[in-house]
Amino acid sequence: MPTPISIGWIGIGRMGYAMAERLAKSGANVTVWNRTREKAQPLAAHGAKVANKLADLAACGIVFVMVSTWKDVKEVIAGPHGLLSAKDVRTKLVIECSSISLEGSAELREVLRARGIELLAAPVSGNAKVIKAGRLSFVCSGPRAAYDQALPYLRMIAPAASYVGEGELARMVKICHNVFLGVVTQSLAEITVLAQKAGVPRHAFLDFMNQSVMGSTFTRYKTPAFVNLDFKVTFTPELLRKDLDLGLDAGRRFDVPLPLASLTRDILQSLIGHGTNDEDFAKLIVHHAKAAGIALEPENVAVDDGLSGGGGK
């Protein structure tokens, strides 16, 4: 481990809290900031310092950012009260973990470069439960030296980190990842509803699927939601819609047809129109069941989510 560097953390939502908590518990010198200070306060019990204003983080050598949208990223970095508003900015590296567009990431890189700060794009695969299970993974792009400097701290949070090259390549990987997330979830919902309408209990069908060559960490992880209809939010339909839109935008930019992504986006929009954004995107299965003329009921069967040996979105 190199000489410890002071770490700043911006954004204490579901993901940000779990990630910052792992950093603090690993002994990193972490100062956290969140728009609602009360959400960050519990991290003090794990050794983190809680900043009163964003500019306080400008004294940190490395600053992580984990917020919801590109608008939020711009505000916390370059807004009137953002990180760069401090009189003395000592930050040398920003590690930006949010899901944002290629264009937004490139713009952020230029804003930071003008202030002598490097950007490491480092979006993630996983959710808060996956983070707590120690199964998160990073995909990173930017200067190789920045990745090498960040790696010890990334590994405090997650066991896996992949470096894919310079610039904004990690954003493209994350966009592709989340397009796959949406398409796979919709496909899994369709075949599970088909099996049930033919008479196969959902838990039995998914038990087979999870043990087959088609099973995956992700299908196991979503099995409890599909079987017992527990849609406590891990990732909202609106956030998935945002990522599908990013994917479709990228498809247009690079002239790659994405018909399955486009159809999944339309289905997701229909789900959102029914006012389900306070629940998990796995509710796609209920939406599809209604289209098939059946009403799902919880099966109340104990099923494993696979987190003891894996994780998922």
Language model features: what each stretch is:
Residues 1-65, 92, 162, 296:
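NAD(P)+-binding Rossmann beta1-loop-alpha1 motif at the extreme N-terminus of oxidoreductases
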Residues 30, 50, 119-120, 161, ...:
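Hydrophobic beta-strand scaffold residues
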Residues 54-118:
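Rossmann-fold NAD(P) dinucleotide-binding segment
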Residues 99-182:
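Rossmann-fold dinucleotide-binding core
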Residues 149, 168-292:
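Helical "substrate-binding/catalytic lid" subdomain
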